[in-house]
Amino acid sequence: LGIKALGDCTRHFQSVECGVAARLQGPFGTFLAGQTGGPSLWIAGGIGVTPFLAVLRTQPLPQPVRLIYLHRSSRDAAYLDELQALAEAQPYLSLAAVANADGMPDLPAVLPAAADLVGVDCYLCGPPGLLMAAVALLQTRGVAPHRLHCERFDFR
């Protein structure tokens, strides 16, 4: 499971020992359910990669997807080895794993240019600060609001 400790409830999951039986429900979101079938840009910040990973594990991609996975270091990059293997196996998946130990990545350098975003649906999942900065930049690069889909992870 990929559960980040963000508050009282999720912090308890970090101390559960291996082998302990637990009953969990969810996830309940519909974040990626409304994909249009055209090209997509997926932007994941840290453990925000999990909804994208769930899709990649269960079905082949029917359209081109560029996944930009932002993380602090390769040691902290959850599921990076699996994502790299999936990118090699899936012809429609392009993976860019970008480490930035200093916090916020250089989004203007990492995100695609405006010409590469025409007709692309953008799906973002990560910390609120990253989402706000990425959405603002994508909008300045011409991405219409109806093509921006965000999933924050702030369950506490």
Model-assigned labels for residue ranges:
Residues 23, 94-98, 149-151:
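General small-molecule cofactor/ligand-binding pocket signal
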